[in-house]
Each structure stands twice: as C-alpha cells, then as structure tokens.
Amino acid sequence: MDIAGKNREQWLAAYPLLQQIVLTKEVWWANPNRQPASEGLARLSLKEEDVKEAEQRLRRFAPYIASVFPETKGAGGLIESPLIDIPTMKHKLDQRFGQNVPGRLLLKGDHALPISGSIKARGGIYEVLKHAESLLVDQQILTKQDDYSLIATDAVQSFFSSYAIVVGSTGNLGLSIGIISAKLGFRVTVHMSDDAKQWKKDMLREKGVRVVEHSADYSKAVEEGRKESDADPNSYFIDDEHSIDLFVGYAVAAFRLKEQLQEKGIAVTKDQPLHVYLPCGVGGGPGGVAFGLKLVFGDAVRCFFAEPTHSPCMLIGMLTGKHQHISVQDFGIDNQTAADGLAVGRPSGFVGRMMAPLLEGIYTIADPMLYTLLADLADAEGLYLEPSAVAGLYGPVQLEKRGLYTDAATHLVWATGGSMVPKEIMETDYQLGVNLRTEQ
C-alpha cells in the first residue's frame, strides 16, 4: 500500500523510530530541524504583532465577557488560568520513577479556565469573538471604540441568530466554541467524532447547540462540518487544522504567562531555561502556545509535545516531514485512546510546518500511565484533570531519563482540561488510576 509516496517497509527502513511507534511503544523523538529561535521565527509568516492584535481584541471584549460570564468578573473579563506550584507531585514523580529531577515543577491550570474548562477556551473563544466583531463592524452595529458590553443586548443576539458557526471536534474545542457561540446568539453546530465523550455532547445540547455525531474519527468530523458550512453563505467554519485565528488565540497565553512567572520571581534565561510540556492532538493549541513562548522567551524556552501511543499523529507527521499527508491509520495504528482530546489520526500540516524550526521534541505516553498520573496528581495536589491533560507530567521524567535537563531549569506542565468533567466520571477515572497503580 502506498503511504505518501513509499510503502510501509520503506518508511520503517528510512525511520527506525517508526518501528517502535507502529508497535504503540512509548518513544522519544528529538527534533533534528530545530533552529535558534531568532532564525526559526524569522522563517514564519506570523509575527508578534499578530499575537498583540489578538490580545487587544480580547481586551475589547472583556466588558462583554464579564457581563455574561460572571465567573470572569474577578479577572475583569479576561479568560485566564492560574500558575500553580506542584512540589508534592514532583516528589511523587521522583519516587515513582526513581529519579531526582532538579528544578521547580509548575502546572499551568488551563483545566480551570472559565467558560469551558480547557485550553480550547483560548483559541476557540477568540476565533468566535473575532468573527462576531467583524460582522458587527461590517454592519456598523459597533465600532472598535465602543463599550463591548453592548453586545449582550437582545438586538445584537437577534442579529447573530441569522448567522451560523460550525466546527468539527473531539470534544473540548466543540465545548468552547459551542458555549460562546450560543451565548452570543449564533446558530451553532458541532460535528463530533466517535471518540468524543458523551458528557461533552450532553453539555453542548443542554446549551442549545446542535451536535452531529459521526461513527468515524476526528478528520471525518471536520470534513463533514466543512461541507455543511460551505453550503450556507451565512455560515462560518472554524477549521482546527488550518486556522491562524485559533493559533494566535492560543499564543496570547505566553505573554500572560510571562507576567505570572515574574510575579512568582521565576527568571527565564538560557542558563535558567523554562521547559514546557504540552499535550498535542491536531496541534493548534500546543502549537500556538509554543509559538507564543518562543516569541516571548526565545532560546530560553524549550517546548515538548506529548501524544498518546495510539494517536501519535504530530510525531509521525514531523518525523517523516509529510505532515497532513500521512496518518497514524496508514501504519495500522488504531487512534483509540482515553485521551479523547488527543485522539487525532492526521495532524495539522500548518502547525507541523510552523513547529519544524521551533519544537524541541515529542514523546508518547500510554493510556495506563495517563490514568496513573491522573490519580497521583489528585492525591498529591488535590487537582483533578482529564486523562489527556496529565500527559505533560511525563515530560520531566523523559528528560531526566535521557540526561537532557538543566539543574537550574523550571519545568512547566500545561494542564489542558478537567474542571468541566462530571464528578462521577472523574471518580471513575481516578479509581482506574488507583487500580492501575496497585497492579504496577
């Protein structure tokens, strides 16, 4: 069978690491194409001004967000998450893996982001707000100098009701886009893949979102969503595989993180680097954050992606250089994982190419380890995440194993989701982790 110009045996011979990947083993890949940040960033079409523009837009919308989502009032309508020290978890990791990773371990709490409880509240909500603003400005309902809390009026909601928003999702992107679009007054449809969790579908329907379920994976859900949207001139399709707006929405996080690190007195320099571990699905969220981090910290930050052993799409795409032209299914990998947000078989080529000169590396993690770390974190720090969100905790362990850490480094695990998970499902996930721990 031809896979992007070669047969399976030729690919395995050309890239020996693929032999382990197709057996769904945990692997580590160091990116051979990484360049100094200044060179890598200079190659890219997106610039710092694009991210600054996104930040300004989010500030314009802050009065509206504060008025319709009371949980954001304390932050003045900005959608932001805490930066949390997790020293007890660091001790637990050292114990579990017989290591002693030097440096401080922090968790970026995007599991607690208001509105939709995941990293997708950054890019997803931003792109919907940008689209809403362009419609309002084009129709002269609003100017960029106005108080955006005016958007909460019935008249504006009525205006938006003649427009539709469509997205394909494994879960969390659909939640963020569904919630904000419905709140604004848009007609919104989320096409969900077969691995999307039932509670996410239920929550969307409760908020008035139309959910279309597919018996295929993420790529098919996106394809069907795009088809539906293309048939309606008043419909706007949010494309997780190619969206620049999603990407810059995520990148804003890096500029806010800089302030949070300063507040904690944490320096980020080449001698005191920041290692950031980001769970990766199709790539938009971690890619956008990594891009922002490179803009802010340059070579003083090292970004790593974490993928499930059964859904290593970005790893295969970047390793082979074939990006979106190759999928995990091409190699007989089933794309079945409890980390539903990461259950993607084909990566974003846009993100893979953006990351080629910037990303330090990618590692994979098996589902049993995700559940084990989920239970460990709950016990150590009282923080409850969904399985995909703990993938970053495995990063410092992988670095130590290979002697790649620096004694003065700060380790930052990006917790991508969890606060919206129903209590009984979280309890089941936790118990599974406890049971797996006992068996190990």
From Swiss-Prot:
NCBIfam families according to UniProt: D_Ser_am_lyase (TIGR02035), PRK02991.1 (NF002823)
Cofactor: pyridoxal 5'-phosphate
Protein name: Probable D-serine dehydratase
Family from the record: Belongs to the serine/threonine dehydratase family. DsdA subfamily.
Catalytic activity of the protein: D-serine = pyruvate + NH4(+)
EC number, UniProt record: 4.3.1.18
Gene source species: Shouchella clausii (strain KSM-K16) (Alkalihalobacillus clausii)
Underlying gene: dsdA
GO MF terms held by the record: D-serine ammonia-lyase activity; hydro-lyase activity; pyridoxal phosphate binding
Keywords assigned: Lyase, Pyridoxal phosphate
Pfam families the record matches: PALP (PF00291)
Tagged with keyword Thylakoid: no
InterPro entries: D_Ser_am_lyase, Ser/Thr_Dehydratase, Ser/Thr_deHydtase_PyrdxlP-BS, TrpB-like_PALP, TrpB-like_PALP_sf
Keyword Lyase on entry: yes
Residues modified as N6-(pyridoxal phosphate)lysine: K120
